[in-house]
Amino acid sequence: MGLTGRKSEKGPVCWRRRVKSEYMRLRQLKRFRRADEVKSMFSSNRQKILERTDILNQEWKLRRIQPVHIMTPVSSLRGTRECTVDSGFSEFSRQVIPLKTLNAVASVPVMYSWSPLQQNFMVEDETVLHNIPYMGDEILDQDGTFIEELIKNYDGKVHGDRECGFINDEIFVELVNALNQYSDNEEDDEEDDHHDYKFEKMDLCDGKDDAEDHKEQLSSESHNNDGSKKFPSDKIFEAISSMFPDKGSTEELKEKYKELTEQQLPGALPPECTPNIDGPNAKSVQREQSLHSFHTLFCRRCFKYDCFLHPFQATPNTYKRKNMENLVDSKPCGIYCYMYMVQDGMVREYPAGVVPERAKTPSKRSTGRRRGRLPNSNSRPSTPTVNSETKDTDSDREGGADGNDSNDKDDDDKKDETTSSSEANSRCQTPVKLKLSSEPPENVDWSGAEASLFRVLIGTYYDNFCAIARLIGTKTCRQVYEFRVKESSIIARAPAVDENTPQRKKKRKHRLWATHCRKIQLKKDGSSNHVYNYQPCDHPRQPCDSSCPCVTAQNFCEKFCQCSSECQNRFPGCRCKAQCNTKQCPCYLAVRECDPDLCLTCGAAEHWDSKNVSCKNCSIQRGAKKHLLLAPSDVAGWGIFIKEPVQKNEFISEYCGEIISQDEADRRGKVYDKYMCSFLFNLNNDFVVDATRKGNKIRFANHSVNPNCYAKVMMVNGDHRIGIFAKRAIQTGEELFFDYRYSQADALKYVGIEREMEIP
């Protein structure tokens, strides 16, 4: 690399020239490195092939080859064509064999590669044309401007077209580091000029001795500056931004350079990453930071990580649970429980002899846990009442006292087993009581992992300190309570339960919902053209009025919405006692499947592992598809055949594929129209299902104006999904057809043969 002289230019034009020259140099070096890697890999593979060939040659030399005996053909038959094989080795005799002509075999239809899917897959829009499709000379002759129009749809962006405009993260960092040398060289020139001026002034004023001292001081300062690596100048990022405007502004490039250089440091964590709570580097962080990965990666609509159906849709961070575990045990868990701890700022002590006397007395109360409010200072009894149930619990340390018999040991074993199972399912129920040691708790320090875990659990169990202590495992409820008091300013209180307002009855809720449907004039045929994608609404403490996104999109509020459970726009489900396959069912009328969380009487929530369910309106979400066979079609290309008989209106399969936007579907559709093969299916006004690259076998079902199947877009747990149903009774082995809803001109263009109708 050739650097400029000491008196180099410093204007923006010069920096642009430097960016271009360094970029071309780095691209060339990368190309050379890639060529060297290919050469070395080719040489290595070639060497392995030669070594393997030598081994095989040695094995063949040790073997004795025996000739293959061929039966002599009958030469008396006329018209028989013979094939003669002569060998150059004396060990092999001349071989003559008759030729047999094979009949022509029909070739299989053309099929483009595709990836099988069992559910829809959301993908981003492709803003760059990855490859220019080959259409054949005939299509290009008919429409020579097709390729140009296709490139215009992608704003002229073609992968690999702009060789000089390509810059990835690796080249970007190398380019900044290379340009930083120019910046350092300019600063050195300025410092040298400044130092020379100071030296001349000091020689004239203070003499040689003072000048030497100042020289040593300045040289030491320059040495220290060289030891610390400086951040690149803003001129570098301004020049790169001017050369590559699509990569971002100057500030964005600076932030990107910081992130990339920090990631290259040893032991560096990704941005917004909290150390493992079980690792040695665990830190004490807030609840939001501990749950950041959970809120980012966990889909609250599918209840799984890395959801492919909602990866680009932000979901609310809080999900309202109906049964929130904010109830606290009214009984203390032991004599050292936090309930006995503080009254008027003083710690109350109890004699140790109280526990054995109480423990020896059998309890007449039931062993079931009662839940109530935390007793306050006014309602707390003056004397502790500890029964046998509280003897072996988390704050009672007298577990090994005399007087315990074999029955107590058996009870302890059962409690320990129950504790381990409850800790594994802490989100479902409050953990049962855990036996700890007999010594009173001492003031101990909280580690970062324990403090972070406490802040996570306090948002679920609130003031149930006994349960939180059992989940943490290393702290007692008394210590948890003390830590809670210290952090009372940053932790939310438990939500108050309004016991005076009774819950609205189910029948009244359905009646109000029916009135609401009549107000918005719900169409019973479900043929509305305005079908929009559902997004959960999130407007706290505000009703779902005209500003609500669900009301604006003419969608019902679902269970994922953050609005009140009494919202008049919230779909309440059905109360059917039948099969939910008629318009008497509100779910069937609204063209949606029964929700197992809402429809509790029709059987949608029962027998989840079985296909024999009373509700017939939950087949898509259960995946109750039929067995389909792929074979060449009598109409066109490949077809799909059914292996089992199907009744009318019975679910056959779901039409799966990539979920793309309407704009992306328009760009892809222009290419598919030229191929005269399209797998696009409108899902709603926002998205389209494309089964060209990814899909399931139902994608091979052909078009017919007299089909035996029909497609229906249904709302399934907040998502639009396409179901294929039987239009009539279908026998085993029949090919499946449904109407693509082509226009008459498109039907003649794309479908050349109509299937033969069965004669009744």
From Swiss-Prot:
Residues 361-373 have a biased composition (Basic residues). Residues 208-231, 356-444 are annotated as: Disordered. Residues 375-388 have a biased composition (Polar residues). Its EC number is 2.1.1.356. It catalyses: L-lysyl(27)-[histone H3] + 3 S-adenosyl-L-methionine = N(6),N(6),N(6)-trimethyl-L-lysyl(27)-[histone H3] + 3 S-adenosyl-L-homocysteine + 3 H(+). Gene3D superfamilies: SET domain (2.170.270.10). InterPro entries: CXC_dom (IPR026489), EZH1/2-like (IPR045318), EZH1/2_MCSS (IPR048358), EZH1/EZH2 (IPR021654), EZH2_SET (IPR044439), PRC2_HTH_1 (IPR041343), Pre-SET_CXC (IPR041355), SANT/Myb (IPR001005). Residues 626-741 form the SET domain. Pfam families: Ezh2_MCSS (PF21358), EZH2_WD-Binding (PF11616), PRC2_HTH_1 (PF18118), preSET_CXC (PF18264), SET (PF00856). Polycomb group (PcG) protein. Catalytic subunit of the prc2/eed-ezh2 complex, which methylates 'Lys-9' and 'Lys-27' of histone H3, leading to transcriptional repression of the affected target gene. May regulate the circadian clock via histone methylation at the promoter of the circadian genes. Belongs to the class V-like SAM-binding methyltransferase superfamily. Histone-lysine methyltransferase family. EZ subfamily. This is Histone-lysine N-methyltransferase EZH2.
